[in-house]
Amino acid sequence: MENNNGNSVINKSNDKNSNNPNYMLLDRIFRLQKHNLSILLSNNNNNNNNNNNNNSNITIQSATNYLNELLNCLNELLTKFQSKTFQSPPQPINTSSTQTNYNNQNNPNPNPNPSPNPNSNNNNNNNTHITIILSTEIIIKILVKFCSVLPMDINYHKISVYGSPINLSLIQLPLKLAQLIVLISRYQNSITFNDHPNELEQLVNYFLYIIKPEKQIASSPSTPSTPSSSSRSQQQQQQQQQQSSSSSLSSSSSFHNVNTNLRIESLKALSSLLHNNGPNITSKLQQPLIECLIELSNYSDQSIDQETKRIAIVSLGNLCMQCGTKLSKYYIQIYDRLSLNLERVTSHINSDKYLIKFTSSILRSMQLLITQAKGILDQKSKSLYNILKTLMFYGVNISSSMSSVLTYQYQFEYSSRKKKQLQQQLANNNVLNSNSNSSSGGASSSSGGSNNTSPAIVTSASIHNSNGNSNENEIEKSTGITSSDSDIDERYNLSKLRFLTITLLNTMAKHSPKVFFGYWTLFLPSTPFPLTPTVFTSMTNDPDIKIKIVAANFLQTIIDGSKDYLVAINTSNHHNHHHSHSKSITTASPIMSRLNLNDNNNNNINNLNSNSFTTFSQNLTSILKEIHNGLIMILVQDPNYILPAFHQQILRCVSTLIINCPYEKLNMPSLLTSLLSAISPYIQNRDHSIQLTSLICIKQLFDITPLSPKELTPVLNNNNFIKIILNFLNNNNNNNNNNNNNNNNNNNNNNNNNNNNNNNILSNTLTSSLINEPNQQHQHQQHQQQNQQHHHQHQQQSLHFNQIEYVKIECLQIIGALTKHNFTILLEYIDLVYNILISILKKEISIHNSSGIVNSQQQQQQQQQQQQQQQQQQQQQQQQQQQQQQQQQQQQQQHNNTQNINNISGLNESSIGNYCLKTFEEITKAIQDSHKNNNTDIDYKICEKEFWNLFFLILPSLTVDPYPQIRASICNIFSNIGSKQFESMTKNLQMHLVSVVLGLIFDEQHIVRASACRSVGILIKIDSLHDDANFLSNSASCLTKSMGDVNINVRIKACWSLANLCDHLVSLKSKQELLFNDIPRQILSKVLESLLNSSFDNPKIRSNVVRALGNFARFADKKVLYNLNETSTFCKINENNNQNYNNQNISDYFHSIGGFNNLMNGVGGGGGSSSSGGGNGSGTIIPTTEEEEEKEEINIENKQKQSLPPQFSNSITLKKDSIILDRIVDSLLKNAQEPSSSFNFVKVKWNACYALGNIFYNQDIEFPNDDNNNNNNNNNKWLPQVYSTLITLMKSCKNFKTRINATSSLATPTHSRRKYGPFYKDVFEAVLESLSNINTVSDTSEFQYRDNLEKQLEIALIHLISEMKSNEIKSFDNCFFQYTDIIVNSFQKHQIILPIPQQPLPTSKTSSSSSSTSSEATPYLSSSVPPSIVTSTPSTTPMISSSNPNTSSLPTSERPTIKEYQKALEIIKEFCQNHNNIDTMDDTQKLHLSQLCLLFDFSESNYQDMYSKLQEVHSTGKSSH
């Protein structure tokens, strides 16, 4: 576009383009070169000197011509943009708002240029009907070009306007450039410099040099930088000052006016440049820019013009937009300046228009700042909230009655809006007429102007006049309202002030909810809200509907996310809550008068209940009640007085309140019932949006905060609510379709008119926008207009259709919520509900069949054909160029629109069907719950029977539905079937159900496959299918294939179902071993192989894999566990075991894992040569010799490693030299030793610990004998690792659930002494150590599992003592004496769990009765062992007493068992007998020994004194130490 020298490089190949005036103007701009214009100022100062030579005259003449050329280019470019000949590309923001702002704000319209170019003006008049949209890059280049050629060595603030016409022309250069930037940005909303940060820096620097205060501007001469010229100019200025003082006064005033206007226009341009471009400002430019703007925005500085301060504040806000943390170190400075200005302005605010506008600008900039500066309100928000509450109600008479305010509101809203538009049009017409009739120019009141007028240089008279009425003109520039509209103007400014105040509060509540929570009492009512001004005051008394809506939005923001804060509410009755006040608010405008009152009056108004004390939790309760009452009061008002937009926002507030309010703590069902009664009439509203929002609120009432049937039934009966909901579902369209169609037609006409005004040619480059002929441009505009009309009509139709469908969806969700929580209410209408839901599903199926929806393969073929056709069309269209491209765009848009409508309708229909099936899911859950609760009501049985009859009739058509959500819902419905429901079905229906679920496992969509896998895992638990070996075999085979699915959700559900299957197989083998043997061994082999392959998959999968592997290790027999080739990937297949069946399943399985098709085809095809041994046509692998067999296995293993999916890359199942048991244990150990501490991996660890305990339940697993450990050492290499891993986890794992499972695995009921082997002592000491450290909890969240862990450790201790041998008791003396208290407490705690027998404990050598000891034990006890001390506390009661506790309610499966406990007592008794005659024990050991004796004998009472003395000795010994 432009070369390095600044010359234009536009292609001139087209002669027509070279004669185009638009092209000529742009070419002239890009050909401009920089000249030294400061010589004109020096020549102007030395105009009395006659010694100028000819060379200087030539230079001055060239500079003058260059100055005129610059002004001509700027004026013509301004005219082009004003007449919309040139336009910038609009942003995706609504352009109507930007255009209205553009028309409302006025810039000074200068006088005509003294030396205009007549040719350019004529050409412009001939081509004003052509609109050319310039790209953003070209606009930026134009602006940068002007910025580079304009002089930077001139101090514009010191130029004398009356000095000469040249001075006046020089000062117009930056003024015109600023006006051009503002004009461009108003249409485009902002000029984006994301890809042009250097250009932005150049423009900002230019205007920053102009707007800097004189204190900051460096001393720069107004003439060329030479000492002679500067001295001469100073002498001449002194002479002029001495000659006439009056002329100096006039020149100084004009100088001040020029300085002010130039700075204001430059600030406007800078503000436009900074809008949304803050992140593009370089770090070097940030500090000087912010310092300059902060200084100019100082409200206390009287030397700065008021409008300058206001626009500087606006610029600060625009600078903060989208900056994030880039300006974090400057946010505090900006906030301090804005807050200080806000405090000073509001301290003496009155009806002055400028003060109101200035306050509004501060509020807007502060909002933009708070959105970016996180945490800035944590320390600097105390005084701000009080000021904002004051401004919320500024200009509102809050003492007005409710009805009068509502009536006045809408009369003003509609009539004043029309009146304002008419007055604006009249004002613009008057301005245009005055401009055309005025001969001397003057100040124009419209920046847009007329197409026949062109902006030029502003004269001194116009500048002086524009500043004479500064306050009025400043208002007119920004709003376009004349003085005749003063009443409307004042209302508009006050409404805007309140609007921005509430918007700022909304932003503060959204970005700092914790800080704002402390100020709830300022803005929310704790008493009936007419007494105190709150947010409800704005919602009810404000005359502007926009403020009502934004106040409701503010209330919604306050409530949203407050659920955690509202937990602290207190519903206790507090006294003195309602008080009678001696004084009431009767002033006409108490909020306005508050600004002029002192702080004492403010406190009196804000704290009306200061005489009583209530806690904050009680205030929260009162606030919630008043919020409900206020919303209900607004909803109950006559809807004719309330606009739909406000009603919709109120309903959104209600929805947010229902979600966040803790109704269970309020314990006030009357609030919910009254709220439901207030919302119910809106479900029949004409507006679909209000109707939809009200249905959402009711759904949340039924679902999130369900009412009881007693509370809900009267409200539903009074409003006929259920019948209305069912009518919505039964009717295709609502009753208000005609009204909606009329509204749509009106909207279409309005949109068509808007489209007619925007006939634009989109172009990305300047050449493409200039090459097209005018006729081609008009044709293209017509085609675009037609396409937009068709597209808009389709959008309106689809939108209307969507609204009706969304209403039906919400109705279905309401029925589902009623079914979930209050199914008894819906039983009265259950027949009608069934008929409506089935009819919706049938209608959907018929629509799918009639529309010709095909499978995914056919769709892919059609897409490929369409792509080929499009490619052919593109090749043909390249030859025909633009016309064919336009036709193609039309066809594609029409085709896309029709496809979008079809897709939208299909998706909506599928969603309706999906929600119908979700409602069926809730019905099946309710029926299942009734079976669990043993509900014998006949209505439930009839409802259940009718449902399944209807559902199975429509089931065949649902299974072939093209939408996966519907097929997945079928599986979810079947997952809610219980055992009784399944048994009540006929055999045909049972077979149909199972076949459908198993068939959907192989669906094309992963959503359906995952749901089907989950359903299989639930069906396995049904009693009728427990004994079905075929079902179990088929389920195992299908789930095994799903374990290799690509989608992770499918693998998670399949693995969970496989774990359930393995759980069932464990119980099946123990109870029905014959039925267990009917399951094919090959299927179990595939299950094990898939589990081992998945043991290193995603942690969500591994948590179920380790559970299934533990169960498998529990029920597998010895032949499977100690086999090397049982689960090898390519196992040998015996010809006697159904070759064809097995080969088919294996090929399917390997196909599901992926990568084995070539090998299986090579084996079974019989045609190709294969290094793996050839094929015989039957699919079996028959190696010829042993060497070929080894080679074959090596090749198979290599191919398998290359073909496994990524999740199996770390699998250990490829080891051939390991037995199955070693591979299972190795997998479990690696999962138990997982170092990650995330929740998913922790779940893997505790399931792996539980699975390791299942190994000790299998009696076929060989453990080493004490006599011959070396013989079986090869079969249990994993045993040391198992014990060391479990001991480590039991002692040091942070997660207590993992420690609990590790402890239970170390002491299973089948854990014999032989299974512990040499690790018995390590386990015993580890359990005692863990019990001693049970109170050391590192994570407080684990404290809830502390008691369960202690109980499990005590059970493990009793079991370990019971398995102790007699010959090794002496080796544990230190443990018994060191941990005596722990052992005694463990036995005492479990005396409630253990049933106490009537007979004494049987022993092999001794026997004792309940009243005396045996003959062998009597001398032992009578010599040295003290008996028990009987106390009244349960904790010290002996384990075995003469009176048995009541154990009828205790479960028999609790541990420790009687056998374990008896053996443990025998070991303790034997330990005490071994230390009976030992005289070397100290007193502490004797005390511990006596405590142990309490566990089995307490009958001797002669040793009470001796035992008490031992206790005294023990206590004195502790005190002495």
From Swiss-Prot:
Metal-binding keyword on record: no
Superkingdom assignment: Eukaryota
Lineage, broadest ranks: Eukaryota, Amoebozoa, Evosea, Eumycetozoa, Dictyostelia
Annotated spans, Disordered: 1-20, 85-124, 218-254, 431-482, 735-797, 1398-1455
A Pfam family: DUF4042
Residue ranges, compositional bias (Polar residues): 455-464, 763-774
Keyword Coiled coil included in the entry's annotation: yes
PANTHER family per UniProt: HEAT REPEAT-CONTAINING PROTEIN 6, MALARIA ANTIGEN-RELATED
Coiled-coil boundaries: 853-903
Protein's recorded name: Putative uncharacterized protein DDB_G0272456
Annotated keywords: Coiled coil
Record organism: Dictyostelium discoideum
Sequence ranges of Low complexity compositional bias: 94-108, 219-254, 431-454, 465-482, 735-762, 775-788, 1398-1453
